[in-house]
Every structure is written in C-alpha cells, then in structure tokens.
A protein has these predicted regions:
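Conserved glycine-rich cofactor-binding loop
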Residues: 12-14
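The beta1-alpha1 cofactor-binding region of Rossmann-like NAD(H)/NADP(H)-dependent oxidoreductases
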Residues: 37-38, 58-69, 102
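Substrate-binding pocket helix/loop in short-chain dehydrogenase/reductase
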Residues: 95-97, 101-109
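Active-site helix of classical SDR
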Residues: 120, 156
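Alpha-helical segment proximal to the catalytic Tyr-Lys
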Residues: 125, 169-172
C-alpha cells in the first residue's frame, strides 16, 4: 500500500526544506519542488538515505506551463497528492510604496499570490474528486497588518489569507481541509533575498532575538496534517517568544 504523498513548493531551503524533512520523517512520500535543481537533488539524496521515497520537480511557480508539465510528468501512483504545502514565497525590498521597484513588486505578486493560485488550481481538483486532501498555505504575520516598507509584501500575505479563507468556503461540502500558517520572524534566507544579498542588513533582522527556525513551522504543518479527519486547523499564528506581533519585537543587548 502506497504511503501518503506531500508536495512542497519552495523546498530548497528554510520552511519548505523543513517541511520536506518533517513529512518524510513522518512517513510520507515527498515531492519537492523549487528552482534550484542542485539543491533539490541534494535534499532528495539526504531524505532517501533516511528511507523516504522522493521525487524532485524543478520549476518556478510563476511559470504556469512549467508547473503543469512538471505535474503531468509524475508517475501514475504519485499523481494523487494528499497534502499540498504552498510554501514558495519571498519578500523584495523595504522601500516606501511611492519609491518601490516594479520588478520587486512583480516577483512578489507573481510568486506569493499567482504561484500559490496556480498550484492550488492544478492540484485541488483531484483532491475534490477523491473527497480527500489538505492544503496548507504558508502565510505570514505580515498579512495581519502592514509595517513600514512592507506595503506590497504585506498585501500579498493578506491575499494569501483571503485566498485560503475563500478556498475553505469552496470545499466546505467536502472532506478537504485548508490551513493558513502565519509565521513571524523565522531565520531563513528570507531576509537575504529581501535585501538582494546584503548579508549584513539581513543579519540585523535577527539581531538580539532568538528567531523561529524553518523546522518549527514544519512541526506546525505536520501537526495540522496529522489531526483527526474531523479536525481542521484553519489558521495558526506562530511567533518567536519575544515577538508580540508583526512590528513589536523585544531585542536583547
């Protein structure tokens, strides 16, 4: 009997990599997707050494055609996905809205919103047909309230909340479950990407506080997926201990 299958987008680092590891540890077959083929191959090797079956799909969620072709390439017994983790996402820049970079905006909107919608649209119909499945979207505390310079990124994560809530309504007459996990400060390469490789500026984001790790969010995702079928963990806000919300953080010396 085939094990359950999870598909994780943006699995080459951070929360996505953590989810791939946690679900593999929990007995799932794992489909990992991302843009970096070398990193995917490395993770696949590590997970297979632990006894997991793993398939890698290299594509950018912004490329709808590539996503469709990648999913079509899956072997027959891998085509039904029990858990979809829409993790791929990023922040770019921290400029005032009136000085924002158009390319940064496009990348955030196309990845965080349209990429998530693409994967949902391609995978969820099969879940509905089987009357079984779980969609876990990785949102953010940033979707609850805007912060200085966060304008468009915050808007994309507010959209993730609305999209997640809307999907939950759409599948309420099925046995599907839909979860929005909203992390606070997580130490990944997120800030390095936001600041276009400025590592010093990125490191300052985590200065004076013990941030969350990707594995912490992965544990929450696995908990939600492991709940009894009649239990739907609809939304979870996960913050570092010294973080009160999206903007209030106590930093030690």
């Amino acid at each position: 009997m085939k094990k359950k299958t999870v598909l994780v987008t943006g699995a080459t680092s951070g929360i996505g990599e953590g989810c791939a590891r946690r679900f593999a540890e929990g007995g799932y077959d794992v489909i990992i997707t991302g843009r970096n083929e070398e990193r995917l191959a490395r993770l696949k090797t590590e997970l297979e050494k632990q006894g997991s079956e793993v398939i890698t799909l290299t594509f950018d969620v912004r490329d709808r055609k590539a996503a469709e072709e990648a999913l079509k390439s899956l072997p027959t017994d891998w085509k039904f996905i029990d858990v979809l983790i829409n993790n791929a996402g990023l922040a770019r820049g921290l400029d005032p809205e009136y000085l924002g970079n158009f390319d940064d905006w496009d990348q955030m909107i196309d990845t965080n919103i349209k990429g998530l919608l693409t994967m949902t649209r391609l995978i969820v119909p099969s879940m509905v047909a089987h009357n079984h499945g779980h969609i876990i979207n990785i949102g953010s505390v940033a979707g609850d309230a805007a912060y200085a310079g966060g304008n468009v990124y915050c808007a994309t994560k507010a959209a993730v909340k609305a999209i997640t809530d809307g999907l939950r309504i759409d599948v309420a007459d099925t046995r599907l479950r839909v979860t929005n996990i909203k992390p606070g400060l997580v130490e990944t390469n997120f800030s390095n990407i936001r600041f276009h490789g400025d590592t010093q500026r990125a490191d300052n984001v985590y200065k004076g506080i013990t941030p969350l790790r990707g594995s912490d969010i992965a544990d929450v995702a696995f908990y939600a997926a492991s709940a009894p079928e009649h239990v739907q963990i609809a939304e979870v806000l996960v913050l570092a201990t010294h973080q009160a919300n999206g903007t209030v953080i106590h930093r030690g010396k």
